[in-house]
Amino acid sequence: MTGADDLFWYVPASSPIYSLKDAAGKTMAFSANGSSSNLATIALIRQAGVDIKAVATGTPAATLVQVMSGQVDIGWSGPPFGIDALQAGKIRIVAVYSDVPAFRNMTVRMHVANLSFLTAHRELADRFLRANAETLDWMYAGDEAITEFASMTGIPPEQARITRDKFYPRGNLALTRLSGLDDAMKDAVAARFITEPLRNDQLDELFKYYLR
């Protein structure tokens, strides 16, 4: 997945915070150290230019409890969780992942597989990728996928539609798109996941099975 529309940060409806610039001295949630929400929180705080403390709060459900009880000022979530609270006017969104310009065109979600498996089962892996691409086409072709997703997750169809159309736009799920690697590697170095950016030959090896 390229682009970053699938995570958002929110406050209770009664909060005086309307943007991160209002949140000096406050706390801002992410899931766990090293997660995408962690990296995004750090980037959002840096971009806001104010002193906000990033805190790990676990799952969206656990985070909502902490926010609504006043333990944390700004919560994080990933749809469909939180859509019902938004619709009910209990919370307000104050930031989204894509507020950081570098994330808008960065590939932020992908499938990974064991190299031994890929070497031994290349045809099977290719079939999986083709099936994934066909499924994505079906998901956005009409309302059948909305009905299925609502049934699977136990949420109303309208919340399923909001989740798909607002937070997972079709353009973000182009499987052949791979972009923003330079910025991603800078983040990886800063987070100490790697010691230095990968060379072109290393990138070619890493993505040799990527769907083209």
What residue ranges belong to the model's regions?
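Immediate post-signal peptide segment of exported/extracytoplasmic ligand-binding proteins
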Residues: S14-T27, A120, A190, T195-N200
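Secondary-structure end/capping motifs
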Residues: T119-T195
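Predominant activation on well-ordered alpha-helical scaffold segments within soluble catalytic domains
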Residues: I42, I83, D182-K186
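Short phosphate-engaging motifs
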Residues: P16, S36-S37, F81, L124, ...
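Short, glycine-/small- and polar/acidic-enriched structural segments
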Residues: M1-T57, Q66-S69, D73-P79, K90-Y97, ...
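Pocket-lining segment of extracytoplasmic ligand-binding domains
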Residues: A61-S151
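Conserved C-terminal helix/tail region of periplasmic/extracytoplasmic solute-binding proteins
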Residues: K186-R212
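Residues at alpha-helix termini
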Residues: A48-V50, A88-G89, T153, A191-R192
